[in-house]
């Protein structure tokens, strides 16, 4: 029997002035950015948590604690590289990743393909194995009033 594992990740960050908005390693021009210890890339964080969950590696808070100064301002793609190395060491291959960004603004559709390409490159998979979507919550809740952004991600891993 093939050993397959499904993982789910969720992340949320507050939007604030004076920070860059980075999603999937792409800097999005906007007047607000996500607040966090690293670059606060909510998309990449959700993807990492999905991958960690599927491989039983815990979560990114365990692997990259916000109390550790080594991770202050770090690119989340660099953290994803470290997760990808742990997956490889554990004998796991990424079958696919699917993520849904939740935000009222800005519109990220024009940058989706670049985000997918960045994530796929770090994970060492073809771009057709990574999908990024975006939706709003119709002005409801903290994402709807642009107080923050959220992201859900799922992945499928296969034991090599």
Across the structure, where does each feature detected by a protein language model lie?
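Pyridoxal 5′-phosphate
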Residues: 132-136
């Amino acid at each position: 029997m093939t050993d397959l594992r499904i993982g789910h990740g969720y992340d949320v960050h507050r939007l604030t002035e004076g920070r860059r908005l980075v999603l999937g390693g792409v800097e999005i021009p906007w007047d607000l950015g996500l607040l966090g210890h690293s670059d606060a890339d909510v998309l990449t964080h959700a993807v990492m948590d999905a991958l960690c969950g599927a491989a039983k590696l815990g979560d990114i808070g365990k692997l990259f604690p916000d109390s550790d100064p080594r991770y202050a301002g770090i690119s989340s793609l660099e953290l994803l590289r470290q997760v990808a190395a742990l997956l490889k060491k554990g004998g796991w291959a990424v079958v696919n990743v699917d993520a849904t960004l939740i935000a009222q603004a800005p519109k990220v559709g024009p940058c989706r393909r670049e985000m997918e390409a960045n994530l796929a490159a770090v994970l060492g998979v073809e771009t057709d194995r990574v999908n990024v979507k975006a939706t709003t919550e119709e002005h409801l809740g903290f994402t709807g009033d642009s107080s923050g952004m959220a992201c859900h991600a799922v992945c499928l891993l296969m034991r090599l």
